[in-house]
């Protein structure tokens, strides 16, 4: 059997890029003399969320539980300060959008209440006011479960949410596992049935969700013209959204990059160059949990994780594409320059599933997990200046 499901097959073409010795030196990670180093987060921090209000960074949830922390970037010597605890249930993979000086936190994966017996795709929403240091649960629910979702804003007044798992299928998987109890045969059957499906059969969200806080209402921003993704990275450049990679089914990522431009009330999408391989001459498997942002009109993508060999198994007809494969965390940093991706340098360590916050012409990477899933508290700043990557 050669190829199954060609409509999902990623064209894993290899691109040979020759670098001179001088070019290799130029793309090496150099200290950024214009940036002040930020202190570590007080706790090992991964699968959380966060945002930036004026000159302060806010992060919380994930491995921090219900805790949230604030760093005044004008007074970094004071370190991270604890703010009010999140009033809802602990959760991972929530998303945050800053609108009119307030943090709006949506969804994630966790229990609906303290007595719940399993985790679920959550659809609730909360607002944090930095001026009063108070949280409020909003009287609304997202139209979809929000796990693996990404979120941003185009105008500072409304949130745009993209992608994520199908709540019924996701929740059902954990329900079925719980029902199997200690019966290993039943558990194995549940696991194989869940992972042994084509990408389209997971029904990842393709609806563009727009939340208007003034009306406390949700509306449609159109439909993605491609398979929904989970764990993508997202950046905003002017009035455009850049959606980068993500998984199209559990364990199988895509190298695709898309640009969304608001036309009227909907986003219209155009394909961008696929992300290149992590090494010269290698194919890109696609990334989930990567960091991204903009520096001097250049899109930067860093870290993330995948299962090398998953596409090879999938194209041989093995729908459980990552079965038997080892998850790999990455440290490469990519830059989109003149509409072409290049390998710009490397992070200090392999890293993914942290928080990306857009700074003034820099990308702030907060926390994340490194090889083996170990949480880190490090804060790293990336910028692109003079055709070079700078890391602080």
From Swiss-Prot:
The keyword Transmembrane helix does not apply. GO terms for molecular function: racemase and epimerase activity, acting on carbohydrates and derivatives. It is found in: Periplasm. Belongs to the NanM family. The active site is at 247 (proton acceptor). The gene is nanM. One of its GO terms (cellular component) is periplasmic space. Homodimer. It holds the Pfam family NANM. It catalyses: N-acetyl-alpha-neuraminate = N-acetyl-beta-neuraminate. It is an enzyme of class 5 (isomerase). InterPro entries: Kelch-typ_b-propeller (IPR015915), NANM (IPR056734), NanM_proteobact (IPR019936). Keywords: Carbohydrate metabolism, Isomerase, Kelch repeat, Periplasm, Repeat, Signal. Its EC number is 5.1.3.24. Kelch repeats lie at residues 56-100, 102-155, 157-192, 193-238, 241-290, 312-361, 363-392. Residues 1-35 form the signal peptide. Converts alpha-N-acetylneuranimic acid (Neu5Ac) to the beta-anomer, accelerating the equilibrium between the alpha- and beta-anomers. Probably facilitates sialidase-negative bacteria to compete successfully for limited amounts of extracellular Neu5Ac, which is likely taken up in the beta-anomer. In addition, the rapid removal of sialic acid from solution might be advantageous to the bacterium to damp down host responses. The keyword Signal applies. It comes from Yersinia pestis. This is N-acetylneuraminate epimerase.
């Amino acid at each position: 059997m050669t190829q199954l499901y060609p409509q999902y097959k990623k064209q894993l073409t290899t691109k040979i890029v020759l670098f001179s010795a001088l070019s290799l030196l130029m793309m090496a990670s150099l200290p950024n003399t214009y940036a002040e180093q930020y202190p570590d987060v007080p706790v090992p921090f991964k699968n959380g969320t966060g945002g930036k209000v004026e000159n302060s960074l806010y992060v919380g949830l994930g491995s921090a539980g219900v805790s949230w922390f604030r760093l005044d970037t004008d007074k970094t010597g004071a370190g991270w300060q604890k703010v009010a605890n999140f009033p809802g249930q602990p959760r991972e993979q929530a998303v945050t959008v800053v609108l009119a000086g307030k943090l709006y936190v949506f969804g994630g994966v966790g229990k609906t209440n303290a007595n719940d017996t399993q985790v679920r795709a959550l659809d609730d929403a909360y607002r944090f006011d930095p001026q009063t240091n108070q949280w409020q649960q909003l009287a609304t629910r997202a139209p979809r479960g929000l796990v693996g979702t990404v979120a941003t804003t185009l105008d500072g007044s409304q949130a745009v949410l993209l992608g994520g798992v199908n709540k019924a299928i996701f929740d059902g998987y954990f329900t079925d596992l719980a029902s199997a109890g200690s019966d290993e045969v039943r558990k194995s059957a549940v696991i194989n049935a869940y992972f042994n499906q084509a990408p389209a059969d997971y029904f990842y969200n393709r609806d563009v969700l727009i939340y208007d806080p003034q009306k406390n209402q949700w509306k449609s921003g159109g439909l993605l013209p491609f398979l929904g993704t989970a764990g993508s990275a997202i950046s905003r450049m002017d009035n455009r959204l850049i959606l980068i990679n993500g998984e199209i089914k559990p364990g199988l990522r895509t190298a695709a990059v898309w640009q969304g431009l608001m036309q009227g009330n909907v986003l219209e999408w155009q394909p961008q160059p696929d992300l290149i391989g992590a090494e010269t001459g290698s194919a890109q498997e696609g990334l989930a949990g990567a960091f991204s942002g903009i520096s001097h009109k250049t899109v930067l993508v860093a870290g993330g994780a995948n299962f090398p060999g998953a596409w090879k198994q999938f194209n041989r007809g093995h729908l459980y594409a990552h079965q038997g494969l080892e998850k790999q965390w990455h440290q490469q940093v990519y830059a989109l320059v003149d509409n072409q991706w290049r390998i710009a340098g490397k992070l200090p360590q392999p890293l993914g599933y942290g928080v990306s916050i857009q700074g003034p012409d820099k990308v702030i990477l907060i926390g994340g997990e490194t090889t083996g899933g170990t949480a880190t508290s490090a804060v790293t700043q990336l910028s692109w200046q003079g055709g070079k990557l700078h890391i602080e």
